[in-house]
Every structure is written in structure tokens, then in C-alpha cells.
Amino acid sequence: MPDNHGPWGLRWRAKPSFILTTVAMGLFTDLVLYGILLPALPFTMRNRFDIPNAEIQHYTSAFLATYAGASVFFSVPAGWAASKLGSRQLFLGGLMFLVVATAIFAFSTSLVLLVVSRLLQGMSTAVVWTAGLDMVQDTVEPSQVGETIGTIFATISVGELAAPVLGGVLYERGGISAVFAVSAVLLAIDLALRALVIDKKTAVKYESPRLIRFPVERNMSDDHVASAPTVMEAQESVHEGTRLLPQVDDDGDHYKIDRELGSIVRAIPLLYCFREPRLHLAMLLSFVQALFIGTFDATVPTVAESLFHFSSLQVGLVFIALMLPYFALGRLSGQAIDRFGTKAAATSGYAFLVPCLMLLGLPEKNLVPKEANVALFCTILALNGIGLAVVTSPGYVEAIDVTTKYQVANPGHFGENGPYAQLFGFSSLYFFTGLAVGPLLGGFLRANFGNAVMGAVYAAISGVTAIVSFLFVGVRRFGPGLV
């Protein structure tokens, strides 16, 4: 048993800055090991498995959808397990799936094993994102959730940005073995951080609550940390009315559970929260965002190869145009949500994406010389990247807001570990469903009708989402018991 002082290095291992760094590194590694394969995947299909050129788009979309489908299937179980076992243990365990998946992909000689590797990586992603975001929610103040998620997403977007480029360089220079070697180094660093981190729920058992700081540390000075509220103080402030953005109403009675619950809802208490339509809309935002991301992941490599005859390295470089806005605008987008609310961010982001998605059909018309056409393609991707950066956080923040209201109105209903692991499990379910549908729908539309029709369909989806966001996101206007 640990002594009264707790585990070795408790203070720094339980610091918010270290917890958030560990979570960010876990998500970063997950995205890198996903993105590092994107530019190499079409070439791997052809060179290792002799897939005909005409079928490469189909196989590429199918493998990406397999990964996302596994994430869909395991998201809710991961949320349930995190709420029962604790997020830190699950966060560490999820890495094992990723290690095995990476090794199988590097050395597999059959399509069946390649499918297995995608399934395992999808399982790992479901666990890592669900448990990781739950640890973030436990660590930061409610009023800082939007900025924190935006900052983390901006940080890990470096992985999204660098991975395709790195994958293209490594595959072109050293083949799949070079890709695996770099992946192994990242996994080793990630494993060390996950083994060391101590989450807040564990840390508070060993020390006085006043020594366990709750909010995000904006810098590392002791004076600043000393002025921060503690876990207990922050929890008290929540019960006194602290709210996540967007702030919508104070009707606590609406969120009060006043009926006998069935066995399924008692086992998964978050299910009751879906009586609130805003939670469904929050999940819809996550689905549509992922739908677009999955489509770009599946179609950008094949468009770049077929239209411009790019190598794997050049395909990786093209992704910079799409991912750079994430890095540049992620934190600003999160701050804007904390200040102006989810309605403004979701509405403006999806409205902005409408014309950007419509432009996707221009490059294939060859209206300008090849060099200018490449620049046009990259510019269109960058514009879409700006829109995607804006719509990254609203769904998460909206869902947290609704769930927090239920938690405050019903103390103890969600158990010792709270509702957020289950929430992020369901959020991941919707997100990865979009990530699974995106490659299939986008690949089908592009292969059968071309980029122009694909862009028009997605622009229509984005327009409808913008209208729904303007009318209903952040505002409780319909549903049972509303006034």
C-alpha cells in the first residue's frame, strides 16, 4: 500500500499541465499513426497486394471505413468501462491495441491481416479518445473547456499536419519499415507518459484536496498555480451555478430526474440525458464534422495521384494545406466558443464550408495550367481547413453543457466517476460513425460522379447543418417538459 504521501512524484504527475500534456500526446500519437499511412496506402495497395488501379479508391475507402467502424463499435463500451474502472487505466490499456495494430500493418502479407490491423487501431482510438477527453474534463474548470479542447486539438493537429508528409517521405525513402520505426519511437514515448500520469480522481485520494489543483495552468509559475481554485472549490462552484458555455438557461427542474429508471438506464445513466434534444444536436455536429474529415482523408490522396500524378511524398505535402488551419486556428476557435457560444461557432463554420465544398470540383475541370491547378487545389483545401477548424469544438462543448446540467440537478445519479466518460463514449460513437461513412460516401460519389457532385452533396449537408445550428444549438426550444 502507498504511504500517506502517495505514489512517487505525485505532485508533478498529477499536475494539470502534465495530465493535459499526456492526453495530448496520446491523441497526437493516435492521429500520427493514422495519418502517417494515408499517403502510402494507395501505393501499398498496388505494390504489396497488386490491387488494380481502378479499385484502389474502393479499397482505400474500405480500409479507412474499417478503422472508423471499429471505433464506432467500441466507443460506448469504452465510455462505460472508463466510468467503472477509471479513465487512466483504460487510457494506458488502449495503447496496447495500437502497438499490436502498428506491428501487424508493418509486416502483414495478406489483406486479411491488414483488416485486422485497422480493426485493432480503431479499437485503440475509441478507448484513447473516450478516456483521454474524460481526463481533460476532470482536470479543467468548466468555463475553460472550450479553450482547452481547442488548444489540445490545435496541438495535436501538428500530428495531423506532419504525419502525411512524414509518411510520404519515409515510405518513399525507406519503405514501410521506415514508417514502422518512427511509429515505434512515438509509441515508446507515449507509453512512458501514460504510465507516469496520475489522474485527479486518484490524486485526491492521497493528498489534501487543496494541494490538487483543478484548472488548466496557463503557465508553470508556482505563484500562478497557488492562486488557482482546488478540486473541491471548483466542484463547489459548479454546484453554485458555474456553467459551461454556451449559457442557455437556469431551469434546473427541466434536468431533474423525477421518475423510476429502467435497468438499462441505471447501468448507463447518460442515456437519460438524451431526452434533451440539444444532446442529439451536439452529437449531430460531431457526426457531420467527422463525415467531412473522413471524406478528405479518403479522396485527397487519390485525387492528387490521379489528377496530378503525385508521388507518396507529394500527396503527403498536399495535406499541409488542409491541416495547417487546424494548427493556426484551433485555440482561437475554442476561445471564441467560450466567449460567444456554440451557436455562433457552429453556424458560421458550417455556413463558411458551403461555398468551400462547392469549389472541390474546380481542379478536375483543368481550367488553368497544371502548376496553377495544383495551387488552386491546395487553396481550396486550405479554405475547407479553415471551416473545419471552426467546427471542431462546438459539438463537444454543447454536449458537456447539457450533461453538466443533468449532473448538477441530480447529484450522485452518475456514480462516483461522473457522466463524462460515458458522454465521450457516445460522442465518439457519432464521430467515428461519420468517419466511417465519410470515406464510403465520398469515395462512391467521386468514383461515380466526380468531385463536383461530391462537393455539391457535402455543401448541401453543411448548409442544412448550419441552419439547424442557428435554429436550435445552444437553445432549448423543443422537447419534453419545455416552456
Swiss-Prot record:
<dbReference type="InterPro" id="IPR011701">
    <property type="entry name" value="MFS"/>
</dbReference>
<feature type="transmembrane region" description="Helical">
    <location>
        <begin position="281"/>
        <end position="301"/>
    </location>
</feature>
<feature type="transmembrane region" description="Helical">
    <location>
        <begin position="424"/>
        <end position="444"/>
    </location>
</feature>
<feature type="glycosylation site" description="N-linked (GlcNAc...) asparagine">
    <location>
        <position position="219"/>
    </location>
</feature>
<feature type="transmembrane region" description="Helical">
    <location>
        <begin position="18"/>
        <end position="38"/>
    </location>
</feature>
<comment type="function">
    <text>MFS-type transporter; part of the gene cluster that mediates the biosynthesis of pyrrolopyrazines, secondary metabolites showing insecticidal activity. Probably involved in the secretion of peramine and other pyrrolopyrazines.</text>
</comment>
<keyword id="KW-1133">Transmembrane helix</keyword>
<keyword id="KW-0325">Glycoprotein</keyword>
<dbReference type="Pfam" id="PF07690">
    <property type="entry name" value="MFS_1"/>
</dbReference>
<keyword id="KW-0813">Transport</keyword>
<protein>
    <recommendedName>
        <fullName>MFS-type transporter ppzB</fullName>
    </recommendedName>
</protein>
<feature type="transmembrane region" description="Helical">
    <location>
        <begin position="62"/>
        <end position="82"/>
    </location>
</feature>
<keyword id="KW-0472">Membrane</keyword>
<feature type="transmembrane region" description="Helical">
    <location>
        <begin position="178"/>
        <end position="198"/>
    </location>
</feature>
<dbReference type="InterPro" id="IPR036259">
    <property type="entry name" value="MFS_trans_sf"/>
</dbReference>
<dbReference type="InterPro" id="IPR020846">
    <property type="entry name" value="MFS_dom"/>
</dbReference>
<dbReference type="InterPro" id="IPR050930">
    <property type="entry name" value="MFS_Vesicular_Transporter"/>
</dbReference>
<feature type="transmembrane region" description="Helical">
    <location>
        <begin position="453"/>
        <end position="473"/>
    </location>
</feature>
<dbReference type="GO" id="GO:0016020">
    <property type="term" value="C:membrane"/>
</dbReference>
<dbReference type="GO" id="GO:0022857">
    <property type="term" value="F:transmembrane transporter activity"/>
</dbReference>
<feature type="transmembrane region" description="Helical">
    <location>
        <begin position="344"/>
        <end position="364"/>
    </location>
</feature>
<feature type="transmembrane region" description="Helical">
    <location>
        <begin position="149"/>
        <end position="169"/>
    </location>
</feature>
<feature type="transmembrane region" description="Helical">
    <location>
        <begin position="310"/>
        <end position="330"/>
    </location>
</feature>
<comment type="similarity">
    <text>Belongs to the major facilitator superfamily. TCR/Tet family.</text>
</comment>
<feature type="transmembrane region" description="Helical">
    <location>
        <begin position="374"/>
        <end position="394"/>
    </location>
</feature>
<feature type="transmembrane region" description="Helical">
    <location>
        <begin position="96"/>
        <end position="116"/>
    </location>
</feature>
<keyword id="KW-0812">Transmembrane</keyword>
